[in-house]
């Protein structure tokens, strides 16, 4: 069982109250084991109960790094648009990240047997339902392409 997160006081809305939605995602979607909402600078804003505080913070930092790399690739090789999603395939499963509200991201860990289409769809639904409630105002958010 995870440890309750101290949520960023600068987050618009009540991010901590979204933890139950992350728990619901983990319990409803087959082979999804962990979920975290994070700020673009890698701060965990909310996490499923399947993550300890340390693991939530570690996953948030990793996911922020991957999103940053993806944005750099889009700026250099693409047309400078927003990064919608990144998927990292590991031997032990997948790490999926998706832009959420302004300055935030949703990251999910899934087992190898996960239906990635379903996981991505459920992530998109969750982002649509919560995106406007999980905005984080950061000094770089306007320049970064998040949200």
What are these regions (language model features)?
Residues 2-32, 41-147:
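Acidic, low-complexity cytosolic segments
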